[in-house]
């Protein structure tokens, strides 16, 4: 068969060459090989010890870390360098009378050692702050477990909450931790779940009345939901205030983390 010659203009021939055979401009090379990295939200996670009855609820802290990781956040973990209110033997649910522990040292267990004194946390260096629950929030970060509506909040915790709120940076809280925002941020909207026990499904339903007594607005939400106070940029979810399957709690925390990250704008 006779060969067929196809006449192609030099300009068209250049266009038909594979990319690897053509000269590229700097901007073309950049567009092909890379893209501008998306800024990562810097999130401070504030712990209150290690263990549901006298510190941080470990499952909540872990769920928060998983969802922050999935959301691409850069996480820094903090805790106050103060003694725990007391130590609970978690096999019995009773105080260990002769034992004392430090909140920062205990929180380091969850942080795998990568933790900083809360006194060094600055809102200027972070885009958001998140507080897991566990009774440590009501015993070590505040005196809510003992004093209810007349409670005091740890001075560093109060400072951090006021700094982030004043800078209009989002704050996430779950389980019992929303009482901290209720005490510090006037008129804030939070949820601790439902307001009736409903046959034991919501064993801490009475906390809703305490939230109201602190001057906050309580918003009823299910365990898989998060409430967003758009004005104050405070996001809350019930977590273990509800007796339910772990994956429901995990989903609710995911909703909270997602909203917090959205509010950072990153």
Curated annotation (Swiss-Prot):
Coiled coil start-end: none
Principal cellular location given in the protein's record: mitochondrion
Alphabetical keyword list: Acetylation, Mitochondrion, Transit peptide
Modification sites for N6-acetyllysine: 149, 155, 162, 201, 217, 221, 231
InterPro entries in UniProt: Class_I_gatase-like (IPR029062)
Record CDD domains: GATase1_ES1
Protein known as: ES1 protein homolog, mitochondrial
Gene source species: Rattus norvegicus (Rat)
């Amino acid at each position: 068969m006779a060969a067929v010659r196809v006449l192609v203009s030099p300009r068209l021939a250049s266009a038909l060459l594979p990319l690897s055979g053509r000269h590229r401009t700097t901007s073309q090379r950049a567009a092909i090989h890379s893209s501008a990295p998306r800024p990562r939200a810097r999130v401070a996670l504030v712990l209150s010890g290690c263990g549901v009855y006298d510190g941080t609820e470990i499952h909540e802290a872990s769920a928060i870390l998983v969802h922050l990781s999935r959301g691409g956040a850069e996480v820094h973990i903090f805790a106050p360098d103060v003694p725990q209110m007391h130590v609970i033997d978690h096999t019995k649910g009773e105080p260990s009378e002769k034992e004392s522990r430090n909140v920062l040292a205990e929180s380091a267990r969850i942080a795998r050692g990568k933790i900083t004194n809360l006194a060094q946390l600055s809102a200027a260096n972070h885009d958001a702050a998140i507080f897991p629950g566990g009774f440590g929030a009501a015993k070590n970060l505040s005196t809510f477990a003992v004093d209810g509506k007349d409670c005091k909040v740890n001075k560093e915790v109060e400072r951090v909450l006021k700094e982030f709120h004043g800078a209009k940076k989002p704050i996430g809280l779950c389980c019992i931790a929303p009482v901290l925002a209720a005490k510090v941020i006037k008129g804030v909207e939070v949820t601790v779940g439902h307001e009736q026990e409903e046959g034991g499904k919501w064993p801490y339903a009475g906390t809703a009345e305490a939230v109201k007594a602190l001057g906050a607005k309580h918003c009823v939400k299910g365990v898989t939901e998060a409430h967003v106070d758009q004005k104050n940029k405070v996001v809350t979810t019930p977590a273990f205030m509800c007796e339910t399957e772990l994956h429901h709690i995990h989903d609710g925390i995911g909703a909270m983390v997602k909203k917090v990250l959205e509010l950072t704008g990153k």
